[in-house]
């Protein structure tokens, strides 16, 4: 998955450092824990003519540490990404996205360009979402997939070339 991401995401993408983890020769993680759960929700945004599906997952991780001024401070983008990478949530989301792509191909063959229907994923860290006073982007990690990603990942899982 890492090599495919390396080909598709632009330099400076928020997942660039995680791609380094995925492509490092020492990377070895069992997939059982990543695919044991389920997608919490798939949200349809966009229009009827241009539907956009977003994979969402809710997390209850405690990210606050001694020395944090406020609970909200623990759920800013930098800390969210550290938690995402530590728990391999980006890899989990890539597996979810590929599964959604395959499901659409199977159950909705009349739709065109299944790979571009699945726009990306959002992880909602609910402890950092404290109501209407929550600052924008606090507690929410969102990533938009590059065009063609899901098809390439699906092909790879089917034994295709990188």
Question: Which ranges hold each PLM region?
Answer:
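Structural signature of nuclease core domains in nucleic-acid processing machines
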Residues: 1-162
